[in-house]
From Swiss-Prot:
It comes from the Eukaryota. It holds the Pfam family URO-D. NCBIfam families: hemE. Keywords: Chlorophyll biosynthesis, Chloroplast, Decarboxylase, Lyase, Plastid, Porphyrin biosynthesis, Transit peptide. It comes from Oryza sativa subsp. japonica. Its EC number is 4.1.1.37. This is Uroporphyrinogen decarboxylase 2, chloroplastic. Belongs to the uroporphyrinogen decarboxylase family.
């Protein structure tokens, strides 16, 4: 087993902010067995397999791959300018040219190891007979919330080829543009999270409506969850068939469930998705992100995913121990760290990488980038991360 990176005091001056000279793009940093620091050229993906995919599969890599959730978005000036020309989120996320342009904005500036499709977990809803929109300042709005058996019976199975051909087209273009220098990432919403939006009518603070359904009419909720399960499995396969090299499943609201309720209303459906995808796409890496999942951590590998993405409320070393050695991890720097000094950002990166170890780790935040994050700090995050060597 290779040694972890050296103590922070051994990092080069350009990382600690002590250098008075103008900052230049840093060399890579190799952490040798005796803790010395050497410069070398940064690693890139191969023609056969991107670095991110290699790391997830447990292959020996020189450094942890890095990308950031919401890396394409409102903190970037280029995105803000595009929004002025195209104020509708639905337009930005459903027009092939705009999806490709936005997805590539961080790639052109930061060169992350993962380029994630610009989209939304609710994008499939119209194809399931669930009208919605995303309203500025309010977020997603489900026009006719699903709160009765009759309403759930009207939900149809999602056929991505018919309803979101622009997703497939955009993924194919991204693969051509990125050319294995980074992994192209797709994503979907998890059944319970999608059901939460659709039953609540949008975002929620207390999730009283879906919990009322779960605890008084569970058969209705199970019917809805099964429809989302079948549909999201199909959607993942569609994304993979059109160029996605890994897919992340977002179960953002699963942490509103107690462990026993997670085992009934989320875990079996996630496992069913994974089992279905692995039957047809056994080599496709699947990542599961469940924000605030510290109380559920040991249950997440039971879904069968390849990677568990940790949020920042779980210590990386503790998370590794609790998850076990047979699963890769992603994360888990606090997004708020990107508002700190460059020296502090560097320290948190090294701390996370040291605790994660030198295998099966994808460096990321513990949540999406926050609005207002200084773009130069994001650039620094990528510079430092891509300079690390195991």
């Amino acid at each position: 087993m290779a040694t972890a990176c050296p103590p922070l005091s051994l990092q080069p001056a350009y990382l600690s902010g002590r250098s008075a000279r103008a900052r230049r793009p840093p060399p890579a940093v190799r952490c040798s067995a005796v803790g010395e620091v050497m410069a070398e050229t940064a690693a890139v993906g191969t023609a056969e397999e991107p670095l991110l995919v290699s790391a997830i599969k447990g292959r020996k890599v020189e450094r942890p791959p890095v990308w950031l959730m919401r890396q394409a978005g409102r903190y970037m000036k280029s995105y803000q300018l595009l929004c002025e020309r195209h104020p509708s989120f639905r337009e930005r996320s459903e027009n092939v040219d705009l999806v490709v342009e936005i997805s590539l904005q961080p790639w052109k500036v930061f060169k992350p190891d993962g380029v994630i499709l610009f989209s939304d977990i609710l994008t499939p809803l119209p194809g399931m007979n669930i009208p919605f929109d995303i309203v500025k300042g309010k977020g997603p709005v489900i026009f006719d919330p699903l709160r009765t058996a009759a309403a759930v019976n009207e939900v149809r199975e999602f056929v991505p080829e018919e309803w979101v051909p622009y997703v497939g087209q955009a993924l194919n273009i991204l693969r051509e543009e990125v050319n294995n220098e980074a992994a192209v990432l797709g994503f979907v919403g998890a059944p319970f999270t999608l059901a939460s939006y659709c039953v609540e009518g949008g975002s929620s603070k207390n999730f009283s409506k879906i919990k009322k359904m779960a605890f008084s009419e569970p058969e209705i909720l199970h019917n809805l969850l099964q429809k989302f399960t079948t549909s999201m499995a199909n959607y993942i396969k569609y994304q993979a068939d059109n160029g996605a090299q890994a897919v992340q499943i977002f179960d953002s609201w699963a942490t509103e469930l107690s462990p026993v309720d997670f085992e009934e209303f989320s875990l079996p459906y996630l496992k069913q998705i994974v089992d279905s995808v692995k039957e047809t796409h056994p080599e496709l890496p699947l990542i599961l992100y469940a924000s605030g999942s510290g109380g559920l951590l040991e249950r997440l590998p039971l879904t069968g995913v390849d990677v568990v993405s940790l949020d920042w409320t779980v210590d990386m070393a503790e998370g590794r121990k609790r998850l076990g050695s047979n699963i890769a991890v992603q994360g888990n720097v606090d997004p708020g760290v990107l508002f700190g000094s460059k020296e502090f950002i560097s320290k948190r990166i090294f701390d996370t990488v040291q605790k994660a170890g030198n295998s099966g780790h994808v460096l990321n935040l513990g949540h999406g980038i926050k609005v207002g994050t200084p773009e130069e700090n994001v650039a620094h995050f990528f510079e430092v991360a891509k300079g690390i060597r195991y």
